[in-house]
A protein has these predicted regions:
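Extended alpha-helical interface modules used as scaffolds for assembling large macromolecular complexes
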Residues: 16-226, 230, 243, 257-273
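Arginine/glycine-rich "motif VI" loop of SF2 helicases in the C-terminal RecA-like domain
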Residues: 234-241
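Conserved beta-strand scaffold positions in the cores of enzyme catalytic domains, especially
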Residues: 246-248
């Protein structure tokens, strides 16, 4: 837009046509500095692969921004790289908790573009298969859901701690990446008598059911469902009315030599609110 004396505002014809035609997309400007940072990410400097995977899954990463020396080309630590990404607008900074996260889906797409090539196949496979996993969950296909989560978990062992609850939550957020289109995803959402591990709240005007996920270690997927009901985690959906899918996922840490042994199991139930 540009001011014009006595004529009000003057707009570019191309912009007006895009607005009238509802033609919108992400046109994120890439800078030379970001291209340089991308090399560090792709080379896994300072264990950036695991950290970027966590960011893409929706995690918040703690950093120390005070060490940054305003040097746009020399990086001594992951703190320097993430602090510069904050300055460039690719990450947002939480002053209270001193953490960084990806601010929106537009920037999230840029991080995915950054990792699409060069040894990130397990992460990309999880993202590509995430829509199929989401609909399998909605359709109640328990065995398929358990199988897909097991695959994502095993293929990302090298960049995530396997036997760690936060890691499992990260894996699930990555495995359900496509859900962000229709849902707002919350981890450890307060509701009832505790905190639900992951809650999928439908966005406005989306015709999809809400989803509540509970994770268990060395117990059972039935126990996970029982905990959702006992602690009334559905109360975290206080403004929601409709169908809710309860998903219990258990990780079995015991060893077995059986050929058909699976570490992950899944139970899915449906209720109405």
């Amino acid at each position: 837009v540009a001011p014009s004396r006595g004529l009000g505002d003057v707009y570019k014809r191309q912009v007006v046509m895009s607005l009238l035609g509802h033609d919108f997309d992400s046109y994120w400007t890439k800078t030379e500095t970001y291209e340089a940072l991308k090399k560090y990410i792709q080379m896994d400097m300072y264990h950036l692969k695991a950290l970027v995977t966590q960011l893409i899954s929706g995690s918040h990463i703690k950093i120390n921004p005070d060490k940054f020396q305003n040097d746009m080309s020399t990086f001594a630590s992951v703190d320097d790289i993430f602090t510069l990404l904050v300055h460039l607008g690719y990450l947002t900074y939480d002053f209270e908790n001193q953490t960084v996260s990806i601010p929106n889906q537009e920037v999230q797409k840029e991080f995915i573009n950054c990792i699409e090539d060069g040894g990130w196949e397990p992460v990309m496979d999880a993202i590509r298969n995430s829509e199929a996993l989401l609909w399998a969950t909605i359709d109640g296909k328990e065995e398929y859901v358990a199988q897909m989560i097991e695959q994502v978990h095993q293929e990302n062992i090298s960049i995530l701690k396997y036997n760690d609850e936060n890691s499992m939550s990260c894996v699930l957020s990555l495995a359900y990446y496509a859900a962000r289109k229709d849902y707002v995803m919350y981890r450890e959402l307060a509701g009832g008598k505790g905190f639900a591990d992951i809650v999928f709240v439908p966005r406005k005007y989306r015709d999809v059911p809400a989803i509540v996920v509970e994770l268990k270690w060395d117990k059972s997927s039935d126990a996970a469902i029982a905990q959702i009901k006992k602690k009334e985690y559905m109360q975290s959906l206080k403004d929601y009315h409709g169908e809710v899918i309860l998903v219990g996922i258990n990780y079995d840490n015991t060893d077995s030599v059986k050929d058909d042994y699976k570490r992950h199991s899944c139970r899915i139930e449906r209720i109405k609110l």
